[in-house]
Amino acid sequence: MIGRARTNLRAEIEDQYEILSFLVSDISSHYQEQVDDVEEKVAEFKKVNANEDYEIVSSELRNFYAASEICDSRCVQSRQILFCAIFAYYETMLNRIIVSYNIRPCNQRDAKSMVEGICKFFLDKYHSSLEIENLVFINEYCRLLRNHFMHGFLSDESKRKALCNYSERFGGTTYYSDIYYEIVDNSFLVKVLKTVLEILTTLDDALCEQRNE
């Protein structure tokens, strides 16, 4: 919205987005540097000790590979933690939108319910529908993935099947059976974070425009 003053709500949405963007980039670089460092040391060790006893070389290489596995594991875990933080940001800002625009009644049980409540409020009050893109990606796929990470397992079989289907449809994760999911790389986190920002700003812009008319 051109010329719009930056409200406290918009400041929260944008500032927390910037913080999360920095964390996603910084943590990725940190662990990738560690992985690259180990790989360089392995290559150098193999070159220097090419003619040494095989058992001795293999023993030392196992130490390098163990260090590499630790880095990889931490990288995977950090993506999972950041993903859950991004979804928590999404839910928190939806709550802030509901409070800021006095949206009542509104089921605040989860992100999906909150967005549905905001859209219903908008339709009932302003007789106009909100057009929001990528809701299935965030409110279905990412919501189920967050629940899987938080609880370690989705107890409902239909939800497990749905998550598998969304993973194949949208990508960004690999899974083994339906009990273990892993975020492939940081590009998925960037996509989720940008999509969340788009949804939040779309809601905020539409509500602010109607309130100011």
Feature-to-residue mapping (PLM):
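Short acidic alpha-helical/loop segments enriched in Asp/Glu that coordinate divalent cations
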Residues: 95-118, 158-163
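Extended intrinsically disordered or low-complexity regions, especially N/C-terminal cytosolic tails and loops
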Residues: 1-84, 133-140, 144, 160-213
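Short, hydrophobic, well-ordered secondary-structure elements
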Residues: 76-98, 143, 150
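Residue-identity detector for glycine
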Residues: 3, 88, 117, 152, ...
